[in-house]
């Protein structure tokens, strides 16, 4: 069995094809929406939810300059999506592991065979977590990557409407903007 994870940048989906041709089963754990959206995140200009490319035609990536606001980067993203098209990748992959039912549903909406989707949610062994009485505070906390696709802007908008503070812990492209 070949198990693929985050192969788009350093490696290539050709790994799935090579394994498949040799009769090796391929399991691919998805961590983003790259197989549906050249931008990875299904966000138009990093802000608005976009599912235009779900129909298989990735030309909207060019029209909207989805990749870094650049025509050249968008052309490269478009070409990559055309070369590694859905049918080709699906044929070479036996199982697609999705970390949520939402992702599995979106992959099926984008044309992937729902029978190949397996949902395996990310987990934590709560038995290994330290328990304690921390007392109730007047805030809630976000811990994670500070980037648009994580919804930090929405969190801050919501926090501004509530009588609670939000503490943000993490790093990423929005770190300086959030300070």
Regions found by a protein language model. Name each.
Residues 1, 10-14, 80-85:
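An amphipathic, basic-hydrophobic alpha-helix
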Residues 1-11, 24-29:
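Short N-terminal targeting/anchoring amphipathic segment
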Residues 10, 126-128, 145-152, 173-175:
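A short, basic/aromatic alpha-helical/loop segment that forms part
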Residues 21-22, 34, 46-95, 105:
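Membrane-proximal helix-turn-helix segments that form the acceptor-binding/catalytic region
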Residues 27, 91-100, 167:
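A short beta-strand/loop micro-motif in the catalytic core of glycosyltransferases
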Residues 97, 132-163, 167:
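Conserved donor-binding/catalytic core segment of Leloir-type glycosyltransferases
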Residues 102, 123:
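Carbohydrate-associated surface elements
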Residues 106-109, 164-179:
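Short, structured helix-loop element that forms part of the nucleotide-activated donor/catalytic region
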């Amino acid at each position: 069995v070949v198990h693929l994870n985050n192969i788009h940048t350093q490696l290539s989906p050709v790994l799935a094809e090579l394994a498949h041709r040799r009769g090796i089963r391929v399991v691919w754990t998805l961590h983003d929406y790259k197989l549906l959206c050249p931008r990875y995140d299904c966000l138009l200009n990093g802000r608005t939810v976009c599912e235009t490319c779900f129909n298989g035609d990735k030309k909207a990536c060019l029209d909207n300059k989805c990749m870094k606001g650049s025509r050249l980067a968008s052309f490269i993203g478009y070409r990559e999506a055309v070369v590694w098209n859905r049918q080709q990748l699906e044929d070479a992959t036996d199982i697609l592991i999705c970390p949520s039912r939402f992702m599995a549903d979106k992959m099926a909406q984008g044309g992937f065979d729902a029978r190949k989707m397996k949902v395996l949610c990310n987990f934590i062994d709560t038995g290994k977590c330290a328990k304690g009485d921390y007392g109730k505070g007047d805030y809630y906390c976000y811990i994670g990557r500070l980037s648009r696709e994580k919804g930090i802007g929405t969190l801050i908008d919501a926090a501004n409407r509530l009588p609670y503070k939000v503490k943000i812990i993490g790093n990423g492209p929005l770190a300086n903007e959030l300070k």
